[in-house]
């Protein structure tokens, strides 16, 4: 159920962050006109939800992203999200141009990969984009989301859920290009979501009960993206760069369509956040700490947000930059996942004990915390 309801906690917290280089006034507006070799990709996608990926052929991560983009396209189509256009725009640099074919071969013929010419106006600059950014537009070509790393990393569900939001929720108001078929599909998705919410088991609320007692300083059921429940005194940090969420400015002027009755204003942001926060992120780790640790709270959450992460098979390894207890026994939200959390030890190895909290210092040592372990295994310096 949590997978199907994965409008991820991260999407709930996105309004807290932004990309400094991103022009926030681009919310719910069409992008500047751009073309590549006399082709207008956005015009060709008119009437479809459009996903524009800014990938760099000379970058290994971008190549991985390209292959995962094809997987995402297939997955969305199987789930019924059929009216979606995917576009890849390669970097303008010479090294990327030389490896254009390699990038193109990583996706199917259903995803066009555009190569910018050397002397043309840089499309990335026009879109205020950076490497690995994903821009999601509605059927009328209005920008709904602009996601950057780490939130655009396709191992995690943020891009997928942002596409689904753009597909079925009128974030920028009514679009006259929405077909009856799409409207019927979105109604069925909404009804299915309501049914699954009603059938939700009680342990979900039991988990929230613990957080309500231990994290009342948060002020609501949603956690700050920077606060670890396992470290209640940890300082709050700004959102990581490379992320811009366009729900932050709902009150701005919209271009083209006057039907504003369906558009949430700034006064509805809290309701929107609460709605999204009721949905769980499959990448949230529930960390059960040893009972014999006096300083250890009952649970901590690693949201996989301020993280360096990788995915190997079905196991997700998170290397957290935040203050975390020196030992966590972690389990994923899905039973079939076997997740090991890799904490970041900030104390010398002798101090890496089960009963001590991590304290930030200039010294940093990798520390792998294993399930049911008796102590934190820290390599010697």
UniProtKB/Swiss-Prot annotation:
The keyword Signal applies. Residues 1-19 form the signal peptide. One of its GO terms (biological process) is selenium compound metabolic process. It holds the Pfam family SelP_C. Residues 204-217, 243-255 have a biased composition (Basic residues). Glycans are attached at residues 46, 83, 119, 128, 338. GO terms for molecular function: selenium binding. The modification Phosphoserine is found at residue 266. Phosphorylation sites are present in the extracellular medium. InterPro entries: Selenoprotein-P_N (IPR007671), SelP_C (IPR007672), SeP (IPR037941). Residues 218-229, 353-369 have a biased composition (Polar residues). Its main location: secreted. Keywords: Glycoprotein, Phosphoprotein, Secreted, Selenium, Selenocysteine, Signal. Belongs to the selenoprotein P family. Might be responsible for some of the extracellular antioxidant defense properties of selenium or might be involved in the transport of selenium. May supply selenium to tissues such as brain and testis. The C-terminus is not required for endocytic uptake in the proximal tubule epithelium. This is Selenoprotein P.
């Amino acid at each position: 159920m949590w997978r199907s309801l994965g409008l991820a906690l991260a999407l709930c917290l996105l309004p807290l962050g932004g990309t400094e280089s991103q022009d926030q006034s681009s919310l719910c507006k069409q992008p500047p006109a751009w073309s590549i070799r006399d082709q207008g990709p956005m015009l060709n996608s008119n009437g479809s939800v459009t996903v524009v990926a800014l990938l760099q052929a000379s970058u290994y991560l971008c190549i991985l992203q390209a292959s995962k983009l094809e997987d995402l396209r297939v997955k969305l189509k199987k789930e019924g999200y059929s009216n979606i256009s995917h576009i890849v725009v390669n970097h303008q640099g010479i090294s990327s141009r030389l490896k254009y074919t390699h990038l193109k071969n990583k996706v199917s013929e259903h995803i066009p990969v555009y190569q910018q010419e050397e002397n043309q106006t840089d499309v990335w600059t026009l879109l205020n984009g950076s490497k690995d950014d994903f821009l999601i537009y509605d059927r009328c070509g209005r920008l709904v989301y602009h996601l950057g790393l780490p939130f655009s990393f396709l191992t995690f569900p943020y891009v997928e859920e942002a596409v689904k939001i753009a597909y079925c929720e009128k974030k920028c108001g009514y679009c006259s290009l929405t077909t009856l078929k799409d409207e019927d599909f979105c109604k069925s998705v909404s009804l299915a979501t309501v049914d699954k919410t009603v059938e939700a088991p009680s342990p979900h609320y039991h988990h929230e009960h613990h957080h309500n007692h231990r994290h009342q300083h948060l002020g609501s059921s949603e956690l700050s993206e920077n606060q670890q429940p396992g470290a209640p005194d940890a300082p709050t940090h700004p959102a990581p760069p490379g992320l811009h969420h366009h729900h932050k400015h709902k009150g701005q002027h919209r271009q083209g369509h006057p039907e504003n009755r369906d558009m949430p204003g700034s006064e509805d942001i809290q309701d929107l956040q609460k709605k999204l926060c009721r949905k769980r992120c499959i990448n949230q780790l529930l960390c059960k700490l040893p009972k014999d640790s006096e300083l250890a709270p009952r649970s901590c959450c690693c949201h996989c947000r301020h993280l360096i992460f990788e995915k190997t098979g079905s196991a997700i390894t998170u290397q957290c930059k935040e203050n975390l207890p020196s030992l966590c026994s972690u389990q994923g939200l899905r039973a079939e996942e076997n997740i090991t959390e890799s904490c970041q030890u900030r104390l010398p190895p002798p101090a890496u004990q089960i009963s001590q909290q991590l304290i930030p210092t200039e010294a940093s040592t990798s520390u792998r915390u294993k399930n049911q372990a008796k102590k934190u295994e820290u390599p010697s310096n």
